[in-house]
Amino acid sequence: MSIEANKEIVRRYQEIYNSNQLDRLSEVLSEDLLTPKIMPGIPQGMEGAKVAHQMMVAGFPDYQTVIDELIAEGDKVVARITMAGTNTGTFMGIPPTGKFISFTGIYIARIANGKIVEHWGEEDGVSLLGQLGVLSL
């Protein structure tokens, strides 16, 4: 696939998440997706991707991710992202604060046969927890 086609797969992936249409994830994610950096306690694969997203939406019902930049080479696409939402639900055991939060992240997606087969992500969890008042910064 071309670099532009791979970028489009990543864009569709974010659109599916942002619209909370998890039943459409199979359009862009491999069933046996490798997610080495997923949150502790979350299963690997597409099921883990769904669980992680549902956890975010439970704590931040208006949660959205904006792609700030895409860089691609070969079969990999790097996305620099900003995630934001209002904390009106319990998140990882933290009671709702009502605060709007925004934090950044970056991930690398490897594409094969038109689907994301590997996903490595890093998010600024310190900023997220600081904005929720859990960490003193």
Residue ranges of predicted features:
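C-terminal and inter-domain tail/linker signature
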Residues: 1-137
